[in-house]
Swiss-Prot record:
One of its GO terms (cellular component) is cytoplasm. This is tRNA N6-adenosine threonylcarbamoyltransferase. It comes from Leifsonia xyli subsp. xyli (strain CTCB07). The gene is tsaD. InterPro entries: ATPase_NBD, Gcp-like_dom, KAE1/TsaD, Peptidase_M22_CS, TsaD. It catalyses: L-threonylcarbamoyladenylate + adenosine(37) in tRNA = N(6)-L-threonylcarbamoyladenosine(37) in tRNA + AMP + H(+). It is an enzyme of class 2 (transferase). It is found in: Cytoplasm.
Amino acid sequence: MNRTASTEEGPLVLGIETSCDETGIGIVRGTTMLANVIASSMEEHARYGGVVPEVAARAHLEALTPALRTAVADAGIDLAAVDAVAVTSGPGLSGALMVGVGAAKALALSLGKPLYAVNHLVGHVGADLLDADGGPGHPVELPTVALLVSGGHTSLLLVRDLVSDVELLGETIDDAAGEAFDKVARLLGLPYPGGPQIDRVAAAGDPRAIRFPRGLTKPQDLERHRYDFSFSGVKTAVARWVEKRQDAGEEVPVADVAASFREAVADVLLTKAIAACLDHGVPRLLLGGGVVANARVRQLAAERAAAAGVELRIPALSLCTDNGAMIAALGAQLIMAGHEPSGLGFGADSTLPVTDVHVV
């Protein structure tokens, strides 16, 4: 079993995260989180029923400097004292990424500090290094399978080494799980963001009321897409079910639909994640991403992991959503492992593969 480095006296790293709609500035020393400031533009996107890339980029421009000032104050440090700057260079929304990358380059250049461009998805794995209350962090035990689920990504990773050996086992071939939650919420007349709304309404529903399809779980699908996900089918099935009831003049049982949809998504996510653990002989599963806030996903993960004899790791919910502290933590791991900084020649890469943990 391998472990990531863990030390309270590690490098002091400032992390910048702007891959989607949350502006994150985090400061860590080794694996100890000193500050984690998140400014969300969710309310602005709610008017449009989803994330608008141009709105997200503009919001990052407005939020970065205030968030940076707050993070430095929270950490109780002088900005010049940081040892390095780390930034998400991808994957994500191009315009949003450019704001963070540009700010990180300017900051690193003005401070005369090394800059590390890192992968957003691997950053979610790095979140497990941190204690949300600011206490000493802890190592990530490796190898681990990581299930990362958000509005923009649904990915299954095999992490043998956090900074040098990350394999993509599978990902969504259409909608991300979080995106499907948003679209189904809209069908049910629920506001954006859909995930929390469906979770709230589903609590009063029967998850067995309607059997919605589980994408890419049939035997013929598993041959080619054993670890891949598909949520467009279940989204369409919900739409047709609701439309049929409405056309018949019947009342739509929103709570039952929400609970049944939530159950279908959670079932697929955990079926494939546990299968990946067992197939690869990996005794632990790490969850990350905003959809991990879903109560049924967490509950089913605990049930399936216990039944399979797999250790389940879930960072604090404040660290599961996009944040700068996880980026800083990954940057610190790169430094402690002796990796070279990125320099200033890299750019934002909206399709950065997960195998590229660090862009040089």
